[in-house]
């Protein structure tokens, strides 16, 4: 399979990362979770006490980060940060850092450079509208806020993180608002993206649907 790029966008907790990961494995192409990149920046910024408004420090921080992927895990400066970037404190802060124009510009540039070298499936908030505008396959994965909150709660409890449904739902709705209303590259469905509501479908059913569409071509 040559010169293929697949863009998968959607709100927090819609299942897009899990779906994109499986598709990458099925089609034997590189999977890039762009959300992990924003989470890694958020983690490093919090560790270094860098606020979202401290633009120059954020730019210097990102430029000092050597980002790569080992399978599905994000590696920064040689360290696997996959577990650290899934902590609730990152969930609560990532949208603030991801809304910073300079942060998005630097990470989008990294993502586009990767797509020029490899066949990729990328998931995020602005893949079909910004990062891979010319991707031949674009999908917008969504689900109701309540369904997404239940999924996120299950994930967190499986990791031993104790949190209640009301707090998770509140966080999901807050992230939806920030992601959809930020000035730079807000979350929105690309006009040529196929909308898939996963509320009443299993991950396997959604993956099969997407793979069928791709293989038709």
From Swiss-Prot:
<keyword id="KW-0808">Transferase</keyword>
<comment type="similarity">
    <text>Belongs to the cytidylate kinase family. Type 1 subfamily.</text>
</comment>
<dbReference type="InterPro" id="IPR011994">
    <property type="entry name" value="Cytidylate_kinase_dom"/>
</dbReference>
<dbReference type="GO" id="GO:0036430">
    <property type="term" value="F:CMP kinase activity"/>
</dbReference>
<keyword id="KW-0547">Nucleotide-binding</keyword>
<feature type="binding site">
    <location>
        <begin position="10"/>
        <end position="18"/>
    </location>
    <ligand>
        <name>ATP</name>
    </ligand>
</feature>
<keyword id="KW-0067">ATP-binding</keyword>
<dbReference type="GO" id="GO:0006220">
    <property type="term" value="P:pyrimidine nucleotide metabolic process"/>
</dbReference>
<dbReference type="GO" id="GO:0004127">
    <property type="term" value="F:(d)CMP kinase activity"/>
</dbReference>
<protein>
    <recommendedName>
        <fullName>Cytidylate kinase</fullName>
        <ecNumber>2.7.4.25</ecNumber>
    </recommendedName>
</protein>
<dbReference type="GO" id="GO:0036431">
    <property type="term" value="F:dCMP kinase activity"/>
</dbReference>
<dbReference type="InterPro" id="IPR027417">
    <property type="entry name" value="P-loop_NTPase"/>
</dbReference>
<keyword id="KW-0963">Cytoplasm</keyword>
<keyword id="KW-0418">Kinase</keyword>
<dbReference type="GO" id="GO:0005524">
    <property type="term" value="F:ATP binding"/>
</dbReference>
<dbReference type="InterPro" id="IPR003136">
    <property type="entry name" value="Cytidylate_kin"/>
</dbReference>
<dbReference type="GO" id="GO:0015949">
    <property type="term" value="P:nucleobase-containing small molecule interconversion"/>
</dbReference>
<dbReference type="Pfam" id="PF02224">
    <property type="entry name" value="Cytidylate_kin"/>
</dbReference>
<dbReference type="GO" id="GO:0005829">
    <property type="term" value="C:cytosol"/>
</dbReference>
């Amino acid at each position: 399979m040559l010169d293929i790029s697949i863009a998968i966008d959607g709100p927090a907790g819609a299942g897009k990362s899990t779906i994109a990961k499986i598709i990458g494995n099925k089609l034997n192409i590189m999977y890039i979770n762009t959300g992990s990149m924003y989470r890694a920046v958020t983690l490093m910024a919090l560790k270094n006490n860098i606020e979202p408004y401290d633009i120059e420090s954020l730019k210097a921080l990102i430029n000092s980060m050597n980002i790569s992927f080992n399978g599905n895990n994000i590696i920064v400066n040689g360290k696997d940060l996959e577990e650290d970037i899934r902590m609730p404190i990152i969930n609560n802060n990532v949208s603030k850092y991801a809304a910073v124009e300079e942060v998005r510009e630097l990470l989008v540039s990294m993502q586009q450079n990767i797509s020029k070298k490899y066949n990729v499936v990328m998931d995020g908030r602005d893949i079909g509208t910004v990062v891979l505008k010319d991707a031949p396959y674009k999908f917008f994965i969504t689900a109701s806020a309540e369904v997404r909150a239940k999924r996120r709660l299950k994930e967190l409890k499986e990791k031993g993180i104790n949190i209640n449904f009301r707090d998770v739902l509140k966080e999901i709705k807050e992230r939806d608002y920030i992601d959809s209303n930020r000035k730079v590259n807000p979350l929105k469905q690309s006009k040529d993206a196929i909308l898939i509501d996963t509320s009443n479908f299993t991950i396997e059913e959604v993956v099969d649907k997407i793979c069928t569409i791709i293989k038709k071509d």
